[in-house]
From Swiss-Prot:
Belongs to the class-II aminoacyl-tRNA synthetase family. Type 1 subfamily. The keyword Transport does not apply. This is Aspartate--tRNA(Asp/Asn) ligase. HAMAP family: Asp_tRNA_synth_type1. The record marks H30, G81 as: Important for tRNA non-discrimination. Gene3D superfamilies: Bira Bifunctional Protein, Domain 2, GAD-like domain, Nucleic acid-binding proteins. The lineage of its organism: Bacteria, Pseudomonadati, Pseudomonadota, Betaproteobacteria, Burkholderiales. It comes from Leptothrix cholodnii (strain ATCC 51168 / LMG 8142 / SP-6).
Length: 598
């Protein structure tokens, strides 16, 4: 039996005989003495193999990297000057008495401590990749986060209840993963995008406080912070106001950060969606970046520069400035690089002005666009931006969405750049906030219809119900997102608990009564049986752990993730299935060669 983890051997065990089991991380032969770094999930310890134990030493000579070993030995102090302050075991070593190879290893395709591996190599050989100390730390932290969440919720009266994985396809924004039913010909289950409706039904059923740490599935285009299957901390509660819900779960996240990584998060400012978009062009602003938009739409309506005046005069247009203190030192090449960057977000280009001497007005400015702006516009730019000598001003002018996306991304990129950090435009800190008062609906110009911004079960703010009949664009939702360092950690809303209001929302979304009954009849029926006021939210566990570890991707905090093409390189999923399986499911492929042989 193992008596201790390798990574936990310390001075406390000095003079004791220990039994350790793990993997040979590294083997070194120094003048007839063999050193083996034994690794397990808790860390490393140095094993010393002396030749005076002939049989053990002979076994040690044959040990290679990644052999699985059992070690019995004496814990002793390392010789002076050989201590390793980076290890828990850094002041001690284990003098080996017995060495058993539990299982040898073929030569690994890479060194476990190699930090320059491609992601393809790492995901193809994920089992070996997971042996790397950083990956083990990431997944151990993930476990501790889950444990702290459960402890907090259990202490606050929440009940862990499972909801179905095979459910009904409902419109929630992304494409569903569909599962054909063998016994119900032509019918399909959907894997849940979230337990949204079931957790609301649990509130109607009277469970009062529910939570679940569960898998959710969305068949959508993938980015660095997305996976087709992801883990959600799902929560719902009855009889609490929006403010009480936010307060409780701000407390939960504070507790989790404090108890897992020793971080005391600062206070959470509350910002409306409208303010966030106005100042930062984003509903999840990174408040570590000290740059804000300056609104210039009204100023540019009468300038003789159509690049600015056309969007300024358009109902859906916007013109903003982004002042970059000290930015006049940027080279033309750097500015051209930012110009190409904003094109990724749909911008046609990037106008700019370098301010050399603000007191001279246009004469103190350097830019190809200055000649197109009248004196009043120049004066207003100077006054509103508060620009100083040596500053640079970027401009965004286009449809409001393009401006928000492009200049919002530019703001973050400049702030995070070496220039931004050198010039104090970025503060390395934890910057949480709540974003509230989201629009309830957004207009789809192509389809000429309104869509729900969050989901169609979000309650409108008091007094906004009538807007659903007259002007859905004015309707504000009781919705809230928790944002940390520019990432949405979680979000939720107060739900609709009255059937007539829910029907009104369906009507605004052009979901007819019959269609609503087919898709959501079970919910509408349940709401008629004294449904309590309720609300909740969901946190992305993958994102929380990614933030804590500062990993580049959520794939670094998931044991067996998918690629950006939704593939598992380890197992080869998704894969072809044989024709017999398809026949049992009453499925025939258009490309008959795509199925395997029966």
């Amino acid at each position: 039996m193992r008596s201790s983890y390798a990574g936990q051997v310390s001075e406390k065990l000095m003079g004791q005989t220990v039994t350790l089991m793990g993997w040979a991380h590294r083997r070194r032969d120094h003048g007839g003495v063999i050193f083996i770094d034994l690794r397990d999930r808790e860390g490393l310890v140095q094993i010393v193999c002396d030749p005076d134990r002939a049989e053990m030493f002979k076994t040690a000579e044959g040990v290679r990297n990644e052999f699985c070993l059992k070690i019995v030995g004496l814990v002793r102090a390392r010789p002076s000057g050989t201590e390793n302050a980076n290890l828990v075991s850094g002041k001690v070593e284990v003098l080996c008495h017995e060495l058993e190879v539990l299982n040898p290893s073929v030569t690994p395709p890479f060194q476990i401590d190699d930090e320059n591996l491609s992601e393809t190599t790492r995901l193809t050989h994920r089992v070996l990749d997971l042996r790397r100390p950083q990956m083990q730390k990431n997944l151990m932290l993930r476990y501790r986060v889950s444990m702290e969440v459960r402890k907090f919720l259990d202490a606050n009266g929440f009940i862990d209840i499972e909801t179905p994985m095979l459910t009904k396809s409902t419109p929630e924004g992304a494409r569903d993963y569909l599962v054909p039913s063998r016994v119900n010909d032509g019918h399909f289950f959907a894997l849940p995008q979230s337990p949204q409706l079931f957790k609301q039904l649990l509130m109607v059923a009277g469970f009062d406080r529910y939570y679940q740490i569960t898998k959710c599935f969305r068949d959508e285009d993938l980015r660095a912070d997305r996976q087709p299957e992801f883990t959600q901390i799902d929560i719902e509660t009855s009889f609490l106001s929006e403010e009480e819900i936010r307060g409780m779960f701000e407390g939960m996240i504070r507790t989790v950060f404090r108890n897992t990584i020793g971080v005391d998060l600062p206070g959470y400012p509350v910002m409306t969606y409208a303010d966030a978009m106005h100042k930062y062009g984003s509903d999840k602003p990174d408040l570590r970046v000290k740059l804000q938009f300056t609104e210039l739409t009204d100023v540019m309506r009468d300038v003789d520069f159509k690049v600015f005046s056309a969007p300024a005069q358009s109902k859906n247009g916007r013109v903003v400035a982004l002042r970059v203190p000290g930015g006049a030192d940027m080279s033309r090449g750097e500015i051209d690089g930012y110009t190409e960057f904003v094109k990724i977000y749909g911008a046609k280009g990037l106008a700019w002005i370098k301010v050399n001497d603000v007191a001279k007005g246009r004469e103190g400015m350097q830019s190809p666009i200055v000649k197109n702006l009248h004196d009043a516009a120049i004066a207003e730019i100077i006054a509103r931006t508060g620009v100083c000598n040596g500053d640079l001003i970027f401009f965004g002018a286009d449809k409001a969405k393009v401006v928000n996306d492009a200049i919002g991304a530019l703001r973050v990129k400049v702030g995070h750049s070496d220039f931004g950090k050198k010039n104090g435009l970025f503060e390395d800190k934890w910057a949480p906030l709540w974003v509230v008062d989201f629009p309830m609906f957004e207009h789809d110009d192509e389809g000429d219809r309104w869509n729900a911004v969050h989901h169609p079960f979000t309650a409108p703010k008091d007094g906004h119900e009538d807007y659903m009949d007259t002007d859905p664009g004015k309707c504000i939702a009781k919705a809230y997102d928790m944002v940390l360092n520019g990432w949405e950690l979680g979000g939720g809303s107060v739900r609709i608990h009255k059937a007539e209001v829910q029907s009104k929302v369906f009507s605004a979304l052009k979901i007819g009564k019959e269609d609503a009954q087919v898709k959501f009849g079970f919910l509408l029926d349940a709401l008629q049986y004294g449904a309590p006021p309720h609300g909740g939210l969901a946190f992305g566990l993958d994102r929380i752990v990614t933030m804590m570890t500062r990993a580049e991707s959520i794939r670094d905090v998931i044991a067996f993730p998918k690629t950006q093409r939704a593939q598992c390189l380890l197992t080869g999923a998704p894969s072809l299935v044989d024709e017999k399986q398809l026949r049992e499911l009453h499925i025939r492929l258009r490309n008959a060669g795509a199925a395997g042989n029966a």
